[in-house]
Amino acid sequence: MPETLSKELIELKETCNTFARDTLLNLPEDPDSRETARNESKRLGLFMMTQPKQFGGTEATQLELTVARETLCSHNAPHVDSVFGPSPGVLGGVGEPLKSTHLSPLLNGEKRSSFGFTEPDDAPKPTSGKIEGETLVVNGQKSYVTGGADADFINALVHIEDLGPSMVVVDTDLDGVNIDKKFSSLDGSHHAAFSFKNVNIPSSNIIGEPGKGLPRAMRQIGDTRLLFAAQACGYMIWVINFLTEHLKSEDRSGEPRGNKDVVRWHYSNA
C-alpha cells in the first residue's frame, strides 16, 4: 500500500487491524469458526467491499481493497479468506438470464464459481466451442482451475468458431465435464484440472459479447494479481515483525540476538 494514506484509508486500516487482533487471532483454525469471522466482517462493513452496489455492496476501489488485504495479512491471522464476500469477477454487468441463474446466487453465497483460463502445455488446440442452434458445444481442457473441485460453475475462456475467444459459464454438473486431477499450491489453495467432451451449454451462457472474452479475462487476472500482491506484502510484514521481535530477545549469554554483527547483516539482507 502507499506510504501516504487519506484519512478514510487510515480509518479502514485501523478497522482491519482491530478486527484481526480482536476477532480473527482469537478464532481456532476450524471450519466452524468461518461463520463467526464472516458475521463480524459483515458488521464492520468489510464483507461487502468486493460486491457491487446494486447487490448491497460498497464496491470498494482497488486501493481500498489493497489496504484492507495487506493489513489483515500482516497479522497472519486465520480465516482471512472468509472476510470478503464473493465478487462478480467476469460476471460483472451481465444481463439476464445469467444475472439470475449465476451472478445473484454467487453474490448471495448460494453458488461457488471458478476461473478457467490456463490450458495444458500439450493441448492439441485451445478449448473450443461451436454454436449449434441455441446450444454451444464445448471441447477442450483447463489445467489450472483454482477452487474448481468445489465450484458449481467455471467461467472459462472458450474459442468459439467464427466468433473468437469468449468467456462462457460452464456448469460443473453437466455431462461431459470431468475433473481429471486435484492438487494444491504452497499458499494452501486448491485447484483442479478439467476436461470438456461435447459439453452442451445454452448459448445464453456466453458472458458479454462473443469474441470479446480475452479483455474481460485479463481484467480478472489483473485484479487477482493485485489481491495476491497485497496479501504477499502483508505476510512479509508479519515475517519481518516476527523476526524483529525474535532478535530483540536474549540468547543464552543474556544479550539480545540482534547485537551480533553477523545476525544484523542477515537481517539487513532480509
Question: Model-flagged regions — what are they?
Answer:
Residues 1-82, 101, 105:
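Amphipathic, small/basic residue-rich leader segments at the start of a protein or domain
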Residues 3-7, 12, 179-270:
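Glycine-rich beta->alpha junctions and the first turn(s) of the following alpha-helix
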Residues 59-71, 123-126, 195, 201:
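Structural signature of FAD isoalloxazine-binding scaffolds in flavoprotein oxidoreductases
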Residues 79-98, 121-123:
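N-terminal glycine-rich flavin-associated loop
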Residues 94-110:
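A generic, well-ordered mixed alpha/beta core segment in the N-terminal half of proteins
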Residues 109-118:
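A short, Trp-centered hydrophobic/proline-enriched beta-strand micro-motif
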Residues 123-139:
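Cytochrome P450 C-terminal beta-domain/meander region
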Residues 135, 139-178:
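A short core secondary-structure module
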